[in-house]
């Protein structure tokens, strides 16, 4: 935007030496006199007189770009550049333009340079005078530094044409130098234009002039540095080498790339560098090389965002692939090529070989010119022809890039619209909005510009990009936050919601206000275990970021529900809900301008969710950004929704329901439903001995009492429950009522203090803890595949060995020592281990081995006898091992594990090639769910499963639970989730359980009968090999034998009895 005269430091009357009379004439004698005076000073302007250039600059700052035409300066410059006999005039014209660009009126002269002298300046780099060559290059560099990045495409066409076809090598080296300058001046646009740049550069690097070769190869390295794809970043030097030395380097580079797993979005810049290599690779002789090229094409194309990106390259890849498909002899390699062809056609939306594909329609600049003039006319503005044409070019380029961000259009167009004499900032904004709406409509897009965009105080208005590991999450996204607004951050798992909040907290968002300007606080959803011994009040007072007195801390804790006793209790004793309230108390005391709330309702009961809702609704001085999967909470709290989609952030006013009305495809955020292409599948459990119906109890508790050491009262009192394969139980209750404690008893993490507890010996339980990530926290640098191979490497679940029921108390150790001594036939024997098990009436007997004795001396001992001897832990350990063995008839191999993870919506790329540290929160929970169900559990226990799964994943989980053949127990505060899943309620309150909706039974006489499924004809061994099962001959029953004998007797009587029948009789 042109500065006001006062801002530019221009005096009311301009003292001038070279154009002294020009300003006075402008005020007194009109335009004719101005032109005459300026024309008289032509020699001074073209001689490089800095005072004359400065006076002209000051005048242009006052009068705007019209001054150039009114004073005849444009004609002077054109005349100077075209004066073939006067090198000083040519140099002076270049220098004058450079001075104007560098002295603050670049936008004013930009349309003139672009429309009138760009070609002349490029050609001047080949002038016979070195001074003119140098001056023209410096002028072009100065112009590139001030021009709008959205004009780069048209400038690039001129530069690339001259670089390829110019007869003078100085022009070529100058163009290459200009390309390097453009890389610095407008890197994002240059990256997008790489498909146009690379083909030209591959020619220029082979120019016959050594100077051109050297300069272009150096420039190619700088240009390739614009490619942001992390997957190929380390291969860029090899890719450049393959362009320079294709015969030697192409096979080597393809070999390098074939071992790469592509996970990041593939853009046009990446394809521009890769396609020359791949196109040449298709012409290599070895079949293996062609196959690798097809694999790379297939993998990369799957990561292309839309057909506009891939279409320019179809003609270079599809014909080659189709040709080798018909010539390859290897059927496996041919199938790979066919897959690549199919992927290219699907993504590019073509049917043929791509050679006759019409380019996607771009916006016509002439039609855009009419739109610009119309929009200006609506605001009673009229631009000069050069400025109007330049605006049309910028608008067309924005539309062709499908960039319809209002902030981008305003920042691009307003500086030029305000150059029009008499224009005001409000008019410029109105023109930008009008053009944005019109161009979006002409391209088939719809853009909503909300009236409240400019209302209220801005806390943040920045544009930035964000990546997580190798994955681009946001690309030139705009984030604008207003004071007092509550923003709900919506997007699918992996879109970058939590990563964005972390980046804001860590100061990694470019342009976000510093902590000195805006106070930002990230509300953690969990507390570090190292703080567990501190009391709640001590923990608050120990935080150096909170400048408050002890009284303020006590008062705030009272406000969020902590009485004096709870304030002085250790953090370790708090439930998840109370820990969240501690985190909220810290945020209140910090007096933040922006609160970042990541799943604030996790672990909170209904009462506390109501409290935090009321707090946020009444919070007028601070802004909140909220990530939550609780649709009711977002509806009650949010004033706006920020939608993370296709690497951008789009704001929608209103709550979640209003957002869904505007964006119907986002309905999954508000409703628990899922499409056919997004589902979970829980593995069906194996049959259990003695269990004939789904309703027969597998776990029983009666009058169980449990108390943590050091606590004043029991956490569970008189609990009686049953669980079966038919169970669908919601465990409900306020925070701290004992829900998680009960679950820990069920899964064996703890043991009851008193009362009876029984589990079926072969029972397998799958468990996902309240803090789900604790399962994988020690393995974040492993891939999900490696984690599974570690956890189940022995055929048992290694997490089982960490449970409390595997450790012996002192009393149990003493009883075990006495019970280990067996007296058999008068001889003492010392118990060693249990090595086998078989049925004994309604129970089991176990094969016991003894120390220093052979296996021939083993004895079978009933289960009750072993338990009475204090060997219950050994019995339970063996039962657990047997249960796992029975459920582990699936091979622990890569293919089987990948299939299992795909049942939970985790793609193979993430399973085998991404470490868990790089997965989103939702993806990590999928890993935890899949790992917990690998052993095909009979009962699955989920502690707060709604905490980290998005709406679509929740819907998929509900659907999977409906079809699951085992039992399910769920702790949740989500009424929507529990009502959609469970028919039985266990209401916990202060350690007491009240069950309702149950149908408990201990017999097999009633309920749904279990039927043994037919076994598959094939099975996979531990090495992943597939084998056919031999069908066993059916054992002949006594009834069958009697029937066969009767048939033989009848044949004997009828005279049809033969020798074969005689053998059968024998």
UniProtKB/Swiss-Prot annotation:
EC number: 3.6.4.-
Entry keyword Nucleus: no
Localisation: Cytoplasm, Cytosol
Chain segments carrying region Disordered: 997-1066
Keyword entries, A-Z: ATP-binding, Cytoplasm, Elongation factor, Hydrolase, Nucleotide-binding, Protein biosynthesis, Repeat, RNA-binding
Domain ABC transporter positions: 454-672, 699-1015
Pathway(s) served: Protein biosynthesis; polypeptide chain elongation
Superkingdom of the organism of origin: Eukaryota
A GO CC term assigned to this protein in UniProt: cytosol
Single Gene Ontology BP annotation: cytoplasmic translational elongation
Catalyses which reaction(s): ATP + H2O = ADP + phosphate + H(+)
Top EC category: hydrolase
InterPro entries assigned to the protein according to its UniProt record, in alphabetical order: AAA+_ATPase, ABC_transporter-like_ATP-bd, ABC_transporter-like_CS, ABCF_EF3_subfamily, ARM-like, ARM-type_fold, Chromo/chromo_shadow_dom, eEF3_ABC2_chromodomain-like
Alphabetical list of Pfam families matching this protein: ABC_tran, HEAT_EF3_GNC1, HEAT_EF3_N
HEAT repeats: 112-149, 151-188, 192-229, 231-268, 269-306, 312-353
Basic residues bias: start-end ranges: 1042-1054
UniProt binding sites for ADP: 418, 735, 944, 947, 973
GO molecular function (one): ATP hydrolysis activity
Disulphide bond pairs: none
Functional description taken from the UniProt entry: Ribosome-dependent ATPase that functions in cytoplasmic translation elongation. Required for the ATP-dependent release of deacylated tRNA from the ribosomal E-site during protein biosynthesis. Stimulates the eEF1A-dependent binding of aminoacyl-tRNA to the ribosomal A-site, which has reduced affinity for tRNA as long as the E-site is occupied. Assists translation termination by stimulating the release of nascent protein from the ribosome by release factors.
Family, as annotated: Belongs to the ABC transporter superfamily. ABCF family. EF3 subfamily.
Protein name: Elongation factor 3
Organism, as annotated: Mycosarcoma maydis (Corn smut fungus)
């Amino acid at each position: 935007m042109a500065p006001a005269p006062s801002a530019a430091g221009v005096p009311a009357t301009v003292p001038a030496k070279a154009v002294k009379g020009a300003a006075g004439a402008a005020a007194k004698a009109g335009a004719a006199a101005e032109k005459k005076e300026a024309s008289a000073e032509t020699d001074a302007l073209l001689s490089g007189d800095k005072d004359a250039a400065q006076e002209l600059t000051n005048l242009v700052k006052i009068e705007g770009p019209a001054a150039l035409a009114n004073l005849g300066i444009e004609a002077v410059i054109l005349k100077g550049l075209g004066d073939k006999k006067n090198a000083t005039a040519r140099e002076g014209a270049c220098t004058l333009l450079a001075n104007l660009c560098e002295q603050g009126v670049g936008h004013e002269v930009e349309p003139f340079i672009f429309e009138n002298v760009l070609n002349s300046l490029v050609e001047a780099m080949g002038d016979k005078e070195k001074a003119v060559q140098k001056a023209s290059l410096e002028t072009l560099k100065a112009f590139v530094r001030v021009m709008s990045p959205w004009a780069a495409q048209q400038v690039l066409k001129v530069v690339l044409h001259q670089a390829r076809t110019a007869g003078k090598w100085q022009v070529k080296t100058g163009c290459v130098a200009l390309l390097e300058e453009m890389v610095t001046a407008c890197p994002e646009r240059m990256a997008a234009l790489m498909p146009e740049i690379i083909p030209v550069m591959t020619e220029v690097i082979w120019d016959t002039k050594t100077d051109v070769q050297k300069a272009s190869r150096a420039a190619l390295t700088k240009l390739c540095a614009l490619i942001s794809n992390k997957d190929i970043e380390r291969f860029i030097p090899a890719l450049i080498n393959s362009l320079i030395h294709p015969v030697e380097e192409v096979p080597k580079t393809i070999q390098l790339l074939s071992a790469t797993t592509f996970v990041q979005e593939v853009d046009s810049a990446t394809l521009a560098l890769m396609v020359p290599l791949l196109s040449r690779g298709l012409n290599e002789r070895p079949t293996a090389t062609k196959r690798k090229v097809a694999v790379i094409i297939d993998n990369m194309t799957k990561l292309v965002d839309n057909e506009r990106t891939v279409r320019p390259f179809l003609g270079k890849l599809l014909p080659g692939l189709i040709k080798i498909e018909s010539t390859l002899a290897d059927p496996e390699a041919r199938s790979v090529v066919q897959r690549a062809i199919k992927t290219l056609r699907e993504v590019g939306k073509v049917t043929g070989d791509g050679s006759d594909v019409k380019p996607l329609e771009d916006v016509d600049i002439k039609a855009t010119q009419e739109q610009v003039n119309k929009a200006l006319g609506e605001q009673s503005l009229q631009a000069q022809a050069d400025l109007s044409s330049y605006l049309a070019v910028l608008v067309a380029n924005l539309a062709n890039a499908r960039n319809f961000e209002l902030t981008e259009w305003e920042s691009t167009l307003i500086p030029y619209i305000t150059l029009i004499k008499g224009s005001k900032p409000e008019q410029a904004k109105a023109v930008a909005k009008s053009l944005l709406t019109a161009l979006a409509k002409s391209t088939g897009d719809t853009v909503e510009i909300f009236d409240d965009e400019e209302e209220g105080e801005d806390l943040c208005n920045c544009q930035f990009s964000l990546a997580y590991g190798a994955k681009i999450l946001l690309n030139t996204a705009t984030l604008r936050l207003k004071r007092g607004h509550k923003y709900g951050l919506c997007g699918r798992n992996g879109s970058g919601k939590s990563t964005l909040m972390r980046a804001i907290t860590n100061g990694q968002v470019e342009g976000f206000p510093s902590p000195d300007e805006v106070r930002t606080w990230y509300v953690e959803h969990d507390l570090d275990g190292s703080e567990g011994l501190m009391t709640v009040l001590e923990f608050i007072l120990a935080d150096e970021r909170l400048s408050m007195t002890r009284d303020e801390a006590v008062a705030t804790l009272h406000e969020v529900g902590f009485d004096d006793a709870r304030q002085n209790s250790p953090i370790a004793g708090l439930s998840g809900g109370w820990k969240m309230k501690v985190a909220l108390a810290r945020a209140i005391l910090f007096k933040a301008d922006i609160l970042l709330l990541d799943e604030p309702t996790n672990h909170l009961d209904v009462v506390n969710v109501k409290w935090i809702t009321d707090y946020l609704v009444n919070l007028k001085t601070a802004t909140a950004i909220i990530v939550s999967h609780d649709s009711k909470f977002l509806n009650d709290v949010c004033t706006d929704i920020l939608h993370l989609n296709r690497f951008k952030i789009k704001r929608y006013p209103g709550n979640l329901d209003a957002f869904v009305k505007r964006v119907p495809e986002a309905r999954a955020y508000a409703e628990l439903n899922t499409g056919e292409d997004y589902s979970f599948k829980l593995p069906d459990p194996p049959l259990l001995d003695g269990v004939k119906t789904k309703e027969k109890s597998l776990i029983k508790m009666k009058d169980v009492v449990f108390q943590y050491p050091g606590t004043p009262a029991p956490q569970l009192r008189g609990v009686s429950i049953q669980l079966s394969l038919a169970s669908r139980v919601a465990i409900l209750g306020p925070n701290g009522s004992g829900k998680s404690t009960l679950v820990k008893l069920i899964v064996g993490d703890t043991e009851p203090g008193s009362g009876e507890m029984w589990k079926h010996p072969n029972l397998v339980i799958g468990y996902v803890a309240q803090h789900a990530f604790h399962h994988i926290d020690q393995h974040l640098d492993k891939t999900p595949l490696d984690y599974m191979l570690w956890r189940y490497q022995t055929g048992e679940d290694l997490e089982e060995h960490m449970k409390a029921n595997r450790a012996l108390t002192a009393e149990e150790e003493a009883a075990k020592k006495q019970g280990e001594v067996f007296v058999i036939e008068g001889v003492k024997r010392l118990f060693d281990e249990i090595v086998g098990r078989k049925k004994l009436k309604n129970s089991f007997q176990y094969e016991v081995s003894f120390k220093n004795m052979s296996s021939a001396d083993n004895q079978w001992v009933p289960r009750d006898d072993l338990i009475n001897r204090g060997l219950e832990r050994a019995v339970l350990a063996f039962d657990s091992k047997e249960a796992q063995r029975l459920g582990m008839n699936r091979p622990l191999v890569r293919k089987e594990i990948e299939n299992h993870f795909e049942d939970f919506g985790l793609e193979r790329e993430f399973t085998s090639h991404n470490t868990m540290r790089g997965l989103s929160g939702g993806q990590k929970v999928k890993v935890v769910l899949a790992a917990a169900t690998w052993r095909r559990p009979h009962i699955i226990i989920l502690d707060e499963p709604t905490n980290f799964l998005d709406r679509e994943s929740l819907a998929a989980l509900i659907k999977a639970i409906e079809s699951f053949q085992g039992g399910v127990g769920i702790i949740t505060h989500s009424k929507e989730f529990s009502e959609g899943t469970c028919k039985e309620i266990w209401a916990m309150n202060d350690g007491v359980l009240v069950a309702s909706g149950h149908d408990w039974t201990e017999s097999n006489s009633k309920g749904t009968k279990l039927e043994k499924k037919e076994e598959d004809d094939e099975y996979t061994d531990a090495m992943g090999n597939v084998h056919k099962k031999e069908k066993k001959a059916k054992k002949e029953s006594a009834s069958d034998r009697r029937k066969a004998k009767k048939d033989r007797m009848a044949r004997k009587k009828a005279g049809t009895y033969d020798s074969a029948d005689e053998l059968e009789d024998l």
